[in-house]
């Protein structure tokens, strides 16, 4: 139950952070490009690398806190952070083909499903 509470609290904070950070970035740079989303994805990718690497090497971060920060906060902030971390680990392990497939399939599948969602929404 403690882990679920960590996820819920940090998830709410991640969602609010995404809202405010992306909004601030959009105010600075406009909406011609998805700068806000791009910014939170970069922040999330950096944070998951930092949190995972630090927490797996140190006893200072409990497993519950690590889960709260990664699944909760970063999950609320962005899902791209997990994608980045997993792809980096594949590359680090010498799995270039799998890492490349992960990038290609993830991006293409998300684009296709975005397109499908738009089609369904337009049909309603």
UniProtKB/Swiss-Prot annotation:
BP GO annotations: cellular detoxification of fluoride
Summary of activators and inhibitors of this protein: Na(+) is not transported, but it plays an essential structural role and its presence is essential for fluoride channel function.
Annotated binding of Na(+), by residue: 75, 78
Disulphide-bridged cysteine pairs: none
Localisation: Cell inner membrane
A GO MF label: metal ion binding
InterPro entries documented for this protein: FluC
Transmembrane region(s): 4-24, 32-52, 67-87, 101-121
One Pfam entry name: CRCB
KW Transmembrane (keyword) present: yes
Cited function: Fluoride-specific ion channel. Important for reducing fluoride concentration in the cell, thus reducing its toxicity.
Family: Belongs to the fluoride channel Fluc/FEX (TC 1.A.43) family.
Protein known as: Fluoride-specific ion channel FluC
Provenance organism: Geotalea uraniireducens (strain Rf4)
Lineage: Bacteria, Pseudomonadati, Thermodesulfobacteriota, Desulfuromonadia, Geobacterales
